[in-house]
Amino acid sequence: MSMLSLLRSQLFNFMPIIHCLLKLNSTRKFKSFQLKAGFWESIKSGLMKNNSMQVIDPPSTDEENVEPLSQDFVLVEKTEPDGTIEQIIFSSGGDVDVYDLQALCDKVGWPRRPLSKLAAALKNSYIVASLHSIRKSHGSEGNEQKRLIGMARATSDHAFNATIWDVLVDPGYQGQGLGKALIEKLIRTLLQRDIGNITLFADSQVVEFYRNLGFEADPEGIKGMFWYPNH
């Protein structure tokens, strides 16, 4: 089957295709990842592990520019020995402060970027998904500590394509499945908006992470091409 035929069949079957850019040994290689049918079916049935949110078909509308539906819910809740309650809140409503984002980037060791550009990137994103830790001390009404611990964002043409960028989780919260949940729910939000062709960029050390989420490399040998200035 030709790649064009594959894309057409995927479009009519609502099977999203996901691509991933890999950087290996200082060279940049583009990998295309097709979402496995089992993952898609689990999303459609709302049975994805650790997800309490049901997927709904987006309502029909005549408006050309429909903004993504904002979703906020508790992903994790735990009580510490001293009675402090911590909740991890997932949000797709773009509630990310640029200074908090810069601090999170510092924690994961990313190079600093100008605050004005960070603010522009957030403003111009189609979806900004975030994870916040909210801690409530025992017996202290109204006294909450809110901290950004994870983020991923997506840009889109609002019709067919979206690209996931800047996936990061606070090192103190890594290894708890939060990055996996963040990506799964961001994908789910995009699918709710009928965005079926999703791309992302991945460093070599996290390729397996995306494979475990159901990504498959290079369908039909598709490669990405990049242009860089010579000076």
Curated annotation (Swiss-Prot):
At the top of the EC hierarchy, this enzyme's class is transferase
GO terms under cellular component: cytoplasm; nucleus
Query: What is the annotated signal peptide range for this record?
Result: none
* Catalyzed reactions: L-lysyl-[histone] + acetyl-CoA = N(6)-acetyl-L-lysyl-[histone] + CoA + H(+)
Q: Its Enzyme Commission number?
A: 2.3.1.48
Query: Residues in domain N-acetyltransferase?
Result: 88-231
CDD domains attached here?
Answer: NAT_SF
Say yes or no: keyword Transferase present: yes
Location(s) in or outside the cell: Cytoplasm; Nucleus
For the keyword Chaperone, the answer is no
GO BP terms:
defense response
SUPFAM superfamilies under this entry?
Acyl-CoA N-acyltransferases (Nat)
User: InterPro entries per the record?
Assistant: Acyl_CoA_acyltransferase, GNAT_dom, NSI-like
Q: Which UniProt keywords apply?
A: Acyltransferase, Cytoplasm, Nucleus, Plant defense, Transferase
State the remark under miscellaneous.
Answer: Plants silencing TAP1 exhibit decreased susceptibility to the pathogen Phytophtora sojae.
Q: What does this protein do?
A: Acetylates histones H2A and H3 in vitro.
Q: Which family does it belong to?
A: Belongs to the acetyltransferase family.
PANTHER family the UniProt entry points to: ACYL-COA N-ACYLTRANSFERASE (PTHR43626), GCN5-RELATED N-ACETYLTRANSFERASE 2, CHLOROPLASTIC (PTHR43626:SF4)
How is this protein named in the record? Histone acetyltransferase TAP1
Origin species:
Glycine max
Gene name tied to this protein: TAP1
